[in-house]
């Protein structure tokens, strides 16, 4: 008689116990996994918010109010997407700080892919912040996009192209919404590359202990 239930349980234990990670890592190594959880939450809530959002300067703010008041569980989705973005940045800054402290930047491919991820994430957050088209988000869109004019020769042309005209208007909001929607999928692709590069090289050994002691 063979107890297949116990065998499958043992295989599951073996699967988790043979992960290529030594016991010399600490709680600071959790934040990569937490970032993936944040990315999943943001993508799901963002999708449902995009269904009800209207990318029009006259209707954007009203559509946010509509999501919060009229859509079933809309206020949860809206708050989760907003607060989740803050959690995303808290996790990524701790993740980076751990990398700097323990010398993870020596793994150049992983570090450069992570830097690209951070820049893409900051751009995504900016485009998302602008979407309600309230007083603060309109001001932020004006001030931050105007920074492009500081680029020699190309600055004014780039700003006009991003605005979709000579001032911030309806085409600007439409472009920002399109960019905010597509960038998370680019982040997912970059995250996959980041993880593959890490697993190709392996994590560092901060305490210099024998990784086979387990």
UniProtKB/Swiss-Prot annotation:
Record carries keyword Transmembrane helix: yes
Location, primary (coarse class): mitochondrion
A Pfam family matched in the record: Cytochrome_B
GO BP term, example: mitochondrial electron transport, ubiquinol to cytochrome c
Other noteworthy facts: Heme 1 (or BL or b562) is low-potential and absorbs at about 562 nm, and heme 2 (or BH or b566) is high-potential and absorbs at about 566 nm.
Family from the record: Belongs to the cytochrome b family.
Summary of the function given for this chain in its UniProt record: Component of the ubiquinol-cytochrome c reductase complex (complex III or cytochrome b-c1 complex) that is part of the mitochondrial respiratory chain. The b-c1 complex mediates electron transfer from ubiquinol to cytochrome c. Contributes to the generation of a proton gradient across the mitochondrial membrane that is then used for ATP synthesis.
Protein name: Cytochrome b
Provenance organism: Bothriechis schlegelii
Lineage, highest ranks first: Eukaryota, Metazoa, Chordata, Craniata, Vertebrata
């Amino acid at each position: 008689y063979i107890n297949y239930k116990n065998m499958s349980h043992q295989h599951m234990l073996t699967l988790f116990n043979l992960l290529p990670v030594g016991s010399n890592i600490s709680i600071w190594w959790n934040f990569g996994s937490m970032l993936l959880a944040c990315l999943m939450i943001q993508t799901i809530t963002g999708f449902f918010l995009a269904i009800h959002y209207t990318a029009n300067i006259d209707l954007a703010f009203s559509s946010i109010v509509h999501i919060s008041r009229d859509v079933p569980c809309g206020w949860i989705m809206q708050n989760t997407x907003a607060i989740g973005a803050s959690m995303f940045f808290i996790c990524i800054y701790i993740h980076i700080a751990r990398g700097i402290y323990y010398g993870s930047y020596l793994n150049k491919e992983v570090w450069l892919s992570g830097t690209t991820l951070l820049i893409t994430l900051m751009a995504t957050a900016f485009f998302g912040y602008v979407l309600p088209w309230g007083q603060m988000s309109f001001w932020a869109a004006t001030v931050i996009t105007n920074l492009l004019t500081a680029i020699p020769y190309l600055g004014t042309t780039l700003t006009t192209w991003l605005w979709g005209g000579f001032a911030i208007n309806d085409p600007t909001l439409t472009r920002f919404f399109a960019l905010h929607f597509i960038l998370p999928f680019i982040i997912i692709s970059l995250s996959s590359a980041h993880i593959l590069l890490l697993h190709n090289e392996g994590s560092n050994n901060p305490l210099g202990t024998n990784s086979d002691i387990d």
